[in-house]
């Protein structure tokens, strides 16, 4: 079978089996298509290549300047592909099993201080329907720690302003209920009453935060809006990431003494070790404060 056909088979079955988001599947597809192109160029087959071939492919990528993080992501996709091919008997072995992951630098997530978050959230002009929407989105994002994808796809039926909760279908189709708090609930209510009808202009939509065309907003559009407000708030937009408010949500909870397992549940992390990064952020902050203010720091 042709390489690309095998990749398509894997992605279609893996998508259904794991309940992955379209964005995750698209990321796998891009990486594995790059592998497929290299195999075709070198007249190699997914069914017969060996570990040396895979090492050659990864080595070429590193020589071309691809970062270790990119190579690690590629290797992760390859491993899942070859595990599938072995399980489904397209291969008699798994050549990726002997490959080592590149060493990754330990990086703490980017986040904003509480004052920076306050400045950012107070930037939109709430007299303008579009900016009232953005204000509500920013408040909800900081109050709940939702992923950007979860925020822009949030539907009316999955939110109760009256009860102050949102129902989120996260990665792997896992459901979680997250409280939104009074401040976020107030601004969402204001948007629903005064901003959303203007944006919809008589059209219907089941998403809470529609675009100006009454459609679901893209992640990219929301990210551009966040950067716009960051610049207005005199925050270095280049230092931000799309999940900056999610990271701020978690970091500020930990800073104020929240139990790590509660933060894990709110973020929708499967593994507690993923959440533990925020304890490191808190420790780094305490270390800097100690160095700054202690007489022997």
Curated annotation (Swiss-Prot):
<dbReference type="InterPro" id="IPR044068">
    <property type="entry name" value="CB"/>
</dbReference>
<dbReference type="GO" id="GO:0009037">
    <property type="term" value="F:tyrosine-based site-specific recombinase activity"/>
</dbReference>
<dbReference type="Pfam" id="PF02899">
    <property type="entry name" value="Phage_int_SAM_1"/>
</dbReference>
<feature type="active site">
    <location>
        <position position="171"/>
    </location>
</feature>
<keyword id="KW-0238">DNA-binding</keyword>
<dbReference type="GO" id="GO:0048476">
    <property type="term" value="C:Holliday junction resolvase complex"/>
</dbReference>
<feature type="domain" description="Tyr recombinase">
    <location>
        <begin position="107"/>
        <end position="291"/>
    </location>
</feature>
<dbReference type="InterPro" id="IPR050090">
    <property type="entry name" value="Tyrosine_recombinase_XerCD"/>
</dbReference>
<comment type="similarity">
    <text>Belongs to the 'phage' integrase family. XerD subfamily.</text>
</comment>
<dbReference type="GO" id="GO:0006310">
    <property type="term" value="P:DNA recombination"/>
</dbReference>
<dbReference type="InterPro" id="IPR011932">
    <property type="entry name" value="Recomb_XerD"/>
</dbReference>
<dbReference type="GO" id="GO:0007059">
    <property type="term" value="P:chromosome segregation"/>
</dbReference>
<dbReference type="InterPro" id="IPR010998">
    <property type="entry name" value="Integrase_recombinase_N"/>
</dbReference>
<dbReference type="GO" id="GO:0071139">
    <property type="term" value="P:resolution of DNA recombination intermediates"/>
</dbReference>
<keyword id="KW-0132">Cell division</keyword>
<dbReference type="GO" id="GO:0003677">
    <property type="term" value="F:DNA binding"/>
</dbReference>
<keyword id="KW-0229">DNA integration</keyword>
<keyword id="KW-0963">Cytoplasm</keyword>
<dbReference type="InterPro" id="IPR013762">
    <property type="entry name" value="Integrase-like_cat_sf"/>
</dbReference>
<feature type="domain" description="Core-binding (CB)">
    <location>
        <begin position="1"/>
        <end position="86"/>
    </location>
</feature>
<feature type="active site">
    <location>
        <position position="246"/>
    </location>
</feature>
<comment type="subunit">
    <text>Forms a cyclic heterotetrameric complex composed of two molecules of XerC and two molecules of XerD.</text>
</comment>
<protein>
    <recommendedName>
        <fullName>Tyrosine recombinase XerD</fullName>
    </recommendedName>
</protein>
<dbReference type="Pfam" id="PF00589">
    <property type="entry name" value="Phage_integrase"/>
</dbReference>
<dbReference type="InterPro" id="IPR002104">
    <property type="entry name" value="Integrase_catalytic"/>
</dbReference>
<keyword id="KW-0159">Chromosome partition</keyword>
<feature type="active site" description="O-(3'-phospho-DNA)-tyrosine intermediate">
    <location>
        <position position="278"/>
    </location>
</feature>
<dbReference type="InterPro" id="IPR011010">
    <property type="entry name" value="DNA_brk_join_enz"/>
</dbReference>
<feature type="active site">
    <location>
        <position position="243"/>
    </location>
</feature>
<keyword id="KW-0131">Cell cycle</keyword>
<dbReference type="GO" id="GO:0051301">
    <property type="term" value="P:cell division"/>
</dbReference>
<comment type="function">
    <text>Site-specific tyrosine recombinase, which acts by catalyzing the cutting and rejoining of the recombining DNA molecules. The XerC-XerD complex is essential to convert dimers of the bacterial chromosome into monomers to permit their segregation at cell division. It also contributes to the segregational stability of plasmids.</text>
</comment>
<feature type="active site">
    <location>
        <position position="147"/>
    </location>
</feature>
<dbReference type="GO" id="GO:0006313">
    <property type="term" value="P:DNA transposition"/>
</dbReference>
<dbReference type="InterPro" id="IPR004107">
    <property type="entry name" value="Integrase_SAM-like_N"/>
</dbReference>
<dbReference type="InterPro" id="IPR023009">
    <property type="entry name" value="Tyrosine_recombinase_XerC/XerD"/>
</dbReference>
<keyword id="KW-0233">DNA recombination</keyword>
<feature type="active site">
    <location>
        <position position="269"/>
    </location>
</feature>
<dbReference type="GO" id="GO:0005737">
    <property type="term" value="C:cytoplasm"/>
</dbReference>
